[in-house]
C-alpha cells in the first residue's frame, strides 16, 4: 500500500502492532471524505443572438476533507496516555502530520485546522492530529521502525519505549 508520507507509513505500522495487541481494530486508510461545502455558482444572464439565457457561472470549488485513518479503540489502549479523542462507539479519526508541518509552503498546516473545526461543527466528529514522533513517545515505537539498514538501533528512537 502506498502512503502519502513516511509518517503515515510509521503510524500504519503502529496501528498494525496495536491491532495485534487488541488495542485497535477496523483500521481504514483514507476513509470516505466529509463533504463540507458544495460547489458555488451564481445565475448570470447571457445575451445570445436572438434571446437571453440564464446560466450558472462558477464561483467556488467544493470543499471536502479526507482523514488519513479511522479505527476503533478498545480499553486496552488506556494503559497509555495516548491523547486520542474518540467519537461515539470509540471510533477515532486521525490526520497524520510530520514534526515540521508548519511553514508557508505547507498548505496542510493552514487548511487542516480549518477543516478540523468545520468537520466538528458540521458532523460532531473530532479529527485527531497525530505527529508520530510525539505519539510514539507517549505510547511506543514499533520495534521494526527502530532498526536501521545497518541492523543497529537508530539514534532517533533510542529513548523511546519500544514494542
Predicted feature residues:
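Electrostatic, structured charged patches in enzyme active sites and in nucleic-acid/phosphate-binding
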Residues: 1-163
Amino acid at each position: 500500500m502506498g502512503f502519502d508520507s513516511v509518517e503515515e507509513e510509521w503510524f500504519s505500522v503502529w496501528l498494525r502492532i496495536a491491532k495485534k495487541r487488541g488495542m485497535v481494530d477496523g483500521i481504514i486508510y483514507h476513509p470516505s471524505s466529509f463533504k463540507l461545502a458544495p460547489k458555488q455558482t451564481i445565475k448570470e444572464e447571457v445575451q445570445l443572438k436572438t434571446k437571453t439565457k440564464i446560466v450558472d457561472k462558477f464561483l467556488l470549488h467544493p470543499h471536502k476533507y479526507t482523514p488519513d485513518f479511522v479505527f476503533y479503540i478498545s480499553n486496552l489502549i488506556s494503559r497509555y496516555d495516548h491523547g486520542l479523542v474518540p467519537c461515539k462507539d470509540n471510533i477515532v479519526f486521525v490526520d497524520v502530520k510530520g514534526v515540521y508541518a508548519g511553514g508557508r509552503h505547507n498548505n496542510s498546516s493552514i487548511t487542516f485546522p480549518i477543516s478540523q473545526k468545520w468537520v466538528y461543527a458540521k458532523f460532531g466528529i473530532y479529527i485527531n492530529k497525530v505527529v508520530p514522533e510525539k505519539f510514539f513517545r507517549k505510547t511506543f515505537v514499533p520495534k521494526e521502525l527502530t532498526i536501521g539498514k545497518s541492523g543497529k538501533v537508530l539514534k532517533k528512537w533510542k529513548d523511546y519505549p519500544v514494542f
